[in-house]
Amino acid sequence: KVRMFHNIYIKNNFFFKKKTYSMNGEDIYIEKTFKKKAGFYVDVGAYHPLELNNTYLLYKKKWNGINIDISSLSIDYFNFLRPDDININVGVSNKNRVKTLYYQKNKSPLNTLNFKQAKKIFSKKFKKKKIKTKTLTNIIDNTKYNGKKIDFLNIDAEGNDFEVLKSLNLNKYKPKLICIELVDHFNPNKKTVKRHKIYKYLIKRNYKLVWSGHFSHMFRR
């Protein structure tokens, strides 16, 4: 495992340096939005510390934060490749409770706590296990970042995104920029986005839609 992590680190930092590490260039927009030397991010459904990641470009610029994923192997990657962050292996939901995880492989960006999403993506070919989940507020409260305002919040929870969002006390942590997936719509038009429950939830809380990609959308306050 150590050799595997080492090879990934060498490849990404010395041979294949990139301008963007996100799926659709989200990190370029995020970097331009803040233009600051250091900041605080929270990434839920972080999956991989370098690949398809919206916070690695910020990490390289001396930002730090919290990475959360339901895969213990993903968090092993983060602990090795991003040791300056707090990396937590836990599920996130709107209550501290036990929920069912639906998965095919231990490390996959498609693992989900949402049964409908699992049926849609995996058909009937998936495994199940019970895991403990916590609210996002509870998770942050129990770190050194308790009470610290979030500069950038990233949520990629495979159909569980709204539940994760609702589990954060926005009045306490006040994220300036939120990137979140509307996984049931690929490349949606503006009317479709505006009908989505996540859009309505954030607009009511004084956020404005400022960027849209194939799945991800960014809201700023």
Language-model features, listed with the residues they occupy:
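Phosphate/nucleotide-binding beta-alpha loop and adjacent structural elements of enzyme active sites
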Residues: 1-221
